[in-house]
Curated annotation (Swiss-Prot):
Necessary for normal cell division and for the maintenance of normal septation. The gene is engB. GTP binds at residues 21-28, 48-52, 67-70, 134-137, 168-170. Gene3D superfamilies: P-loop containing nucleotide triphosphate hydrolases (3.40.50.300). Residues 13-189 form the EngB-type G domain. It comes from the Bacteria. This is Probable GTP-binding protein EngB. Belongs to the TRAFAC class TrmE-Era-EngA-EngB-Septin-like GTPase superfamily. EngB GTPase family. Keywords: Cell cycle, Cell division, GTP-binding, Magnesium, Metal-binding, Nucleotide-binding, Septation. Disulfide bonds: none annotated. Pfam families: MMR_HSR1. The lineage of its organism: Bacteria, Pseudomonadati, Pseudomonadota, Alphaproteobacteria, Maricaulales. SUPFAM superfamilies: P-loop containing nucleoside triphosphate hydrolases.
Amino acid sequence: MGAVALDHLPEPDRLEVAFAGRSNVGKSSLINALTNQKGLARASGEPGRTRELNFFNVEGGDLRIVDLPGYGYAKAPKPVVEKWTRLTKAFLRGRVNLKRVYLLIDSRHGLKDVDLKIMDVFDEAAVSYQVVLTKTDKIKPPAVKRLIGETGEKIARRPAAFPRVIATSSAKQDGVDQLRAEIVALLPDMG
């Protein structure tokens, strides 16, 4: 289900986790890897393909995944990009059942100024978020380790940031089980 306005959002009847990141960071690919459903979230090589809030109910669970529009570069007119930005900020500030946002960072590029600005939005809205490095198969293991440390240092003083940085590769499935376990740990105990 896609939402282009707040009044199109699904009922807040289950826990939600959202995926945010710059355009082409690998949000859709990671969502597909996490759910083991190749075509669930539409992945594209075209930056700015996701143009609405996309909601995916996870089968057999009390969880909904939200794919947020990419920020930064997008092949869309400026007023359209501004509309996505307003919608995303309003969603983040007002969604009572949003448990955590996973902020995806392309490991080839690391944290950029635009990522720090979105972290400011999360911090101001008191939305818990966790940094997830993507595409780690594209850089050497020592560089991944260094990037995890550098990123951890940069988020250490941020009030809403979860301190653990997760490194993933959707292509090789690296870190996907760890991220899935983090998400499952957020769910209420069903026992």
